[in-house]
A protein has these predicted regions:
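Membrane-proximal helix-turn-helix segments that form the acceptor-binding/catalytic region
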Residues: 82, 143, 147, 164-167, ...
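Conserved acidic donor-binding segment of nucleotide-sugar-dependent glycosyltransferases
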Residues: 309, 313, 411-412, 416-422, ...
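Short hydrophobic beta-strand element within catalytic cores of glycosyltransferases
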Residues: 370-373, 389-392, 396-400
C-alpha cells in the first residue's frame, strides 16, 4: 500500500489543474464566472474535508459498497452486499439505479441504497474538455456523497470504472481512517482502448491513473489468478483472487417452474408460444412445455426446439455477429444486432432478445439446453461471469477463446471453446445433432457439471474476503 498522505498534494493539485483547464476554455468563451465558480468549489471541498475529518467512532460494522455504474447490472457487487449483510455488517450501497437490483437487496434491512446520478461532460468544445468536465462533476458528486455518509469501516469499490472513483475514494478513506478495498474486475484503460486504441493520449493517461492510484488500496481483490499475477508483476499490487462463483439461486429449473416462466414470456414474446400461437388453449402449452389441467402434470413438449441462450451486455467486448454467422452458415450494441437479426431469414431458428427481471434470469438459465458465451476480455485477464452462472445451472457452454479462459471452461469436459464462427457452427451441429437425447456429448457435459458440484459464492466469499475484514487493524 502507498502512503496516502504523501499523495494528497497530488490529488489536490489534480483538482485545481482540472479546474484551471476548464476555466481556461471558458475564459475564451467569455465564461470567466465559471473559473471563479471552480476556484470557490475547490476551497469548499477542502473546508468540507477538514470539517468532516474525524469519524464518529461508530464505524466498526459499516461497509460502503461502491460502483460508479448501474447497481442492477453489477451482480458481483450485489453478492458482496448480501454477504456483508449476512455477517452483520450495515451496508451502504452507492451507485446508479438504472436497473432494479435483486429482491434480496431491496428486502434486506441491513442494506441502504444511495443512488447517484450518471453525469455528463459539456457537450460543446473539444473532446478533452468533455472528459475533463465529466471527471470534475463526478469527482465532486462522489466526494460529497462519501463525506456526507456516516464513517465506514471499509469502502469496497468496483473497478472498472475507476476514473475518478479510485482517487476520490482513497482520499476520503485516508481522511476518515477507513480501509479501502478495490475489487478488480478488469482494467478500465483496456476497455477505453477498444474505442480509442492503445496509444490514444486518454488511454495512456487512464492507464497511468489506474496503476498509480490503485496502489493506495489497503486490500485488493481480483477475478482470476492471471490478473493477480499481472497486478503484482506490472503494478506492484498484491491481490487476493476471488473467483466469481454462482449463488444458490443458480440451479437447474424444475419443469413446472420452466412452464410457468415460458407461459409468462409467451404473452410478450411469440417465440415462446406453442405452434398454434394460442397461449390459453385447453391444455396450456408453450413451445417447450405443456400442462395437463386434468391431472396437473407438466411435461416437456415432444420434438421441442433447442433453447440456446447467450447472455449479452451488448458491449464492444462481445461480437454477437459470431453467433449470427454460425446460425446463418455463412460469413461476410443492441439495435445494431437487432437490425442484423431482422435481416436474416432463418427457416428453423427463432431469435428472441428479451430483458429479464433479476429473479427470472436464473430460472431461464436453468431451463436452457446450451449456453453460448461471446465475451472476449479486453485485458485477457478476466472471466465471463455469465458462464459462471450457466455452470451453476449445470448448463454446458460453447465459449469464444481468450488467454485465461481455461481457468473456467475445460474443453471437452464442461463445454467447448471456439475461435471463430465456423468452429462454433461445427460445434452446434455436433452437440445438437441428436437433441434431445441424453447420451449425447451435451448430456455428457451436463453430467460432468452435476458431478463436479462446485463451490458457491457464500463459501468462496467466507474463505477469501471475510478474513480480510476480521483481521486486526
Amino acid at each position: 500500500m502507498v502512503d496516502v498522505d504523501s499523495a494528497m498534494p497530488l490529488l489536490a493539485g489534480s483538482l485545481i489543474v482540472a479546474g484551471l483547464v476548464t476555466g481556461y476554455y471558458f475564459i475564451r468563451s467569455n465564461g470567466i464566472w465559471l473559473l471563479l465558480l471552480v476556484s470557490v468549489t475547490v476551497v469548499l471541498i477542502f473546508w468540507l474535508i477538514q470539517t468532516l475529518r474525524k469519524g464518529n467512532g461508530l464505524s466498526e460494522r459499516r461497509v460502503c459498497v461502491l460502483v460508479l455504474g448501474d447497481i442492477g447490472r453489477s451482480p458481483r457487487m450485489q453478492y458482496h452486499a448480501i454477504s456483508l449483510s449476512k455477517h452483520g455488517y450495515s451496508v451502504t450501497f452507492v451507485g446508479f439505479l438504472g436497473t432494479k437490483p435483486h429482491q434480496d437487496i431491496l428486502r434486506d434491512d441491513n442494506i441502504q441504497i444511495i443512488a447517484i446520478d450518471e453525469v455528463k461532460g459539456l457537450q460543446v468544445g473539444p473532446r478533452i474538455l468533455t472528459y475533463a468536465t465529466k471527471v470534475i462533476r463526478q469527482s465532486l458528486q462522489l466526494l460529497f456523497v462519501l463525506m456526507k455518509m456516516d464513517v465506514q469501516s471499509y469502502v469496497l469499490m468496483q473497478n472498472p470504472p475507476g476514473l475518478p472513483s479510485i482517487a476520490v475514494t482513497s482520499l476520503v478513506c485516508s481522511l476518515r481512517s477507513t480501509k479501502f478495498i478495490i475489487d478488480w474486475h478488469n482494467y478500465g484503460y483496456t476497455i477505453m482502448a477498444l474505442t480509442h486504441g492503445q496509444e490514444h493520449p486518454i488511454v495512456r493517461v487512464a492507464k497511468w491513473y489506474e496503476r498509480f492510484f490503485g496502489r493506495f488500496a489497503c486490500y485488493n481483490l481480483c477475478v482470476t489468478n492471471a490478473m493477480k499475477k499481472d497486478l503484482e508483476k506490472n503494478w506492484g499490487i498484491k491481490a487476493t483472487t476471488l473467483y466469481d462463483k454462482p449463488p444458490l439461486i443458480f440451479k437447474e429449473t424444475p419443469v413446472k417452474l420452466q412452464h410457468e416462466l415460458f407461459m409468462r414470456l409467451a404473452k410478450t414474446y411469440p417465440q415462446f408460444q406453442s405452434g398454434d400461437g394460442n397461449v390459453w388453449c385447453e391444455t396450456e402449452r408453450t413451445a417447450y412445455t405443456g400442462h395437463n389441467p386434468t391431472d396437473g402434470t407438466v411435461t416437456r413438449t415432444p420434438g421441442r426446439p433447442v433453447l440456446l441462450l447467450s447472455s449479452t451486455s451488448w458491449t464492444e467486448d462481445e461480437d454477437f455477429s459470431i453467433l449470427l454467422k454460425a446460425l446463418e452458415g455463412k460469413g461476410p450494441q443492441k439495435d445494431y444486432y437487432r437490425k442484423l437479426i431482422d435481416a436474416l431469414e432463418f427457416e428453423h431458428v427463432k431469435i428472441c432478445t428479451p430483458w429479464l427481471d433479476a429473479e427470472d434470469y436464473p430460472v431461464l438459465l436453468g431451463s436452457a439446453d446450451l449456453g453460448v458465451c461471446l465475451h472476449k476480455s479486453s485485458s485477457g485477464l478476466d472471466l465471463p461471469m455469465k458462464v459462471v452462472d450457466m455452470f451453476g445451472c449445470c448448463l454446458p457452454v460453447c465459449a469464444i477463446h481468450f488467454s485465461c479462459l481455461h481457468e473456467l471452461v475445460k474443453h471437452e469436459e464442461n463445454g467447448l471453446i471456439f475461435k471463430n464462427s465456423w468452429e462454433l457452427a461445427q460445434q452446434l451441429k455436433s452437440l445438437l445433432s441428436d437433441f434431445p437425447g441424453t447420451k449425447s456429448r451435451l448430456g455428457f457435459f451436463r453430467k460432468n457439471l452435476r458431478a463436479s458440484g462446485g463451490t458457491r459464492w457464500d463459501e468462496n466469499w467466507d474463505k477469501n474476503v471475510l478474513p480480510l475484514l476480521t483481521a486486526p487493524w
